[in-house]
Amino acid sequence: AEWGCAGSWTWATEIEWKYPARAGMDPVTLRWFDGVKPGVPYDKDHVDKIGVCRQRAYQNLPPVVEELEKKYGQSLGCLGSIFVGEKGIIRIGPHGDGLVFGPKDLYKKRPPKLFPREKGMDHPTDWLRAIRNPSRPCGCNFDYSAPLATTVLLGNAAPRAGVKKLLWDGRRFTNDDAANQYLRATYRPGWELMG
């Protein structure tokens, strides 16, 4: 990781999470790449005011992106997620938009919907609806959104601990007590959260 200033995000991050096989599911490896490519300065010539690289050539992209673009003959863009499977790939944009399939015929028919969605309903409104009618959970249900949020937050804490393997038990890092300091914010006097 390359750092900006204390308390800031990293200039560039590469993180890998490994999830073991469980309850009828295969093991999964998740790799996260962001920020500027190693060696590219983090300055106004290379990065805009909200931290987005001005050119794709400056981005810290996974090495496999160019290989997949050549294989499937289409651009995968520079922001979003790529799911690599045995039959091909699916790429989604940073907001769940811009689906790209490789090979293109991978997308033959729409899969069944697994989670109910309210058209035109934003997250806070959907959350309030679920409070009023608990028989139908939120579209962004805590059953999967809480583990997802934990994964992302661990991705923020891990680079601060340095380049190493960290083991997580659901509450703390079990193999590095020093890394646990990054799991909670230290507030200035008068700004503490109560309770």
Where would I find each of the regions flagged by the language model?
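Glycine-rich, aromatic-lined ligand/substrate-binding cores of catalytic
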Residues: A1-C138, A149-G170, N175-Y182, T186-G195
